[in-house]
Amino acid sequence: MADNMTTTQIEWRMKKMAIGSSTHSSSVLMKDIQSQFEQLKLRWESYPNLVKSTDYHQRRETIRLVTEELYLLSKRIDDNILFHKTVIANSSIIADMIVSLSLLETLYEMKDVVEVYSRQCL
């Protein structure tokens, strides 16, 4: 069964098994997601300049990498939301879900901008 799973799915399963359902562990996972989001946001701020200042092949690669990174992080947040739905609700987990949904909304907005850049630049 593991042969058919992607690396992301395997990592998620491992984290899910290691996490259990404790609130503390849930917060650790959420902090990890927020950290990854902040790193993406820093790269995102320089994204328009990267796209404008490179040649065609570099633009395509930049757009592909950013799109892939946006997708992977949004998938991870989706998985986090699904994980929280399986855990007994408490105020900390509900707060994490609200933050997850907010991050997901921002990622979708970023994805829309990437699509506009890719149409303009390619």
Swiss-Prot record:
Family affiliation: Belongs to the influenza viruses NEP family.
Stated role: Mediates the nuclear export of encapsidated genomic RNAs (ribonucleoproteins, RNPs). Acts as an adapter between viral RNPs complexes and the nuclear export machinery of the cell. Possesses no intrinsic RNA-binding activity, but includes a C-terminal M1-binding domain. This domain is believed to allow recognition of RNPs bound to the protein M1.
Location in the cell: Virion; Host nucleus
Superkingdom: Viruses
The protein's name in its UniProt record: Nuclear export protein
Keywords: Host nucleus, Host-virus interaction, Transport, Virion
Keyword Transport: yes
Motif Nuclear export signal, chain ranges: 10-19, 86-95
Description of how the protein assembles with itself and partners: Interacts with protein M1. May interact with host nucleoporin RAB/HRB and exportin XPO1/CRM1.
GO cellular component term of the entry, any: host cell nucleus
Gene Ontology BP term (one): exit of virus from host cell nucleus through nuclear pore
